[in-house]
Amino acid sequence: MRGSARVRAPRVLKERSIGDSDLTIDQLREILRSHRVLHLSLAARDRIAHSRKIVEELAEGPGALYGINTGFGVLAHQQISRSDLEQLQENLILSHAVGVGDEVPIEIVRLMLLLKAQGLALGYSGVRVLVIDYLLRFFNEDFIPIILTKGSLGASGDLAPLAHLTLPALGFGEVDFKGSRISAKIALQRLGLEPLRLKAKEGLALINGTQFMSAYAVYCLIRIQLLLATADLAAAMTLESIRGSAAPFNARIHEARPHPGQVRTAAIMRQLLTGSEILPSHLDCPKVQDPYSIRCVPQVHGAARDAYAHAHRVVEIEINSATDNPLVFREGDILSGGNFHGEPLALILDYLAIAVAEIASISERRLYLMLGGDTLGELKLPRLLMKDTGLNSGFMLPQYTAAALTSENKILAHPASVDSIPSSLGQEDHVSMGATSATKLLEVVKNTETVLAIELMSAAQALDFIHPLKAGKGVEAAHAEIRKSISFAESDRLFHDDIQCALRLVRSGALVHAAEKSVGPFTK
């Protein structure tokens, strides 16, 4: 009716079951971004219930079974009376919640909830369906446990952070509940839930596992995929600004050394440079070869791309694996092993840190090249990318920041996995230190995103001196996107603000998306 108020349709949240099939990193990205409502599949419920029945039957017997009626670690040989089994599980969570340091980012904690539920849904852990329902309810309701970054040795699993993940289900600790920090008890009341009383083996199943390392790995891989595409775009823009040659990207060169990442990167560079007016404008210049930071982009970026691909494969195996101990098998056996050991993740997390640090290293060198100005004097590219230097410092200091971050990355890229300190009075005599690998990788990723942002904002400044000649279509599209929010710098100004703006463009994917609209996709 005319004049009546329009009724807004309620937002419909899409549901997704877990436990039927493996999860991919792409699916995890989509789940995080779309806020899907998760629930256990019927098949998973049956599988979990069967596993739980085995545990309950064995718990009634007289024998000692690790994780069910014994102590833990060096205390594994000490049998616990049947009347104390529930208290044993609560004590385990409380005693292992010893994390320190900064808080884990909320998106990573959400991944931990999801990955822990996925691991338990495989049916090897012997927990009740109710336990997994709690985890998924937390995920769906933005009930985010407060977890601290430090305290895990990466074997026996991520004990401390996973204990902090579990605490709120028992009514302990604090949570971020729908954006507000409140006590876990109050948050449970708002959800209409009672604190969970853990049964035999459930506490151990919740804290044994690699979900802290895995969540960091998934989160970083999602960011690194965009970072690699951004690095190619930055390299292409810098190449145009210093009148570099596209000859090193000729497909025949890379067919002669066909590492997949190298071949792919060279193809992306050709794609981004398509339609350039700058490239043919200096074909007869006296320059014979560009410096390595330009000429070897396919080899360096490509090697990082191959490291990403290897890590991607390893992580997708890990997030769909049983990393608990002991494991409960359908035949009725309970077997102790070492699937909680984080070595597979620790190695690839360290590998990724090295690869991403190299992206920052070569980006900073390209930035430095631009600041030297136009050595041939043909396109009037001024030193420090500003005409009136002396009075103005130009882009001198943004390079300092890039250099500082690049140097910090070199320290962070030292592999944590080469170290091990025995714990539990020698029972756990080799650990992966993969949790340290995980947290420092995220810092390397953040630093490298910033270095690329500085390169891109500087390359945009340089291109403006070369216009009206047009760069390649992909480069021009990204340049136009930068200029929507960062203007050409005629003189010194607060470059901190420009860096932050460029960083937002990098992390949002706005520059890559703008280029892809012009030349087609190149992110994958």
Predicted region positions:
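FAD-binding core of FAD-dependent oxidoreductases
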Residues: Y66-L88, S95-Q118, L148-L170, K199-M213, ...
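C-terminal auxiliary extensions adjacent to catalytic cores
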Residues: P10-R36, L40-R47, S51-A59, P168-K524
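FAD-binding glycine-rich core of flavoenzymes that anchor FAD
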Residues: G123-K150
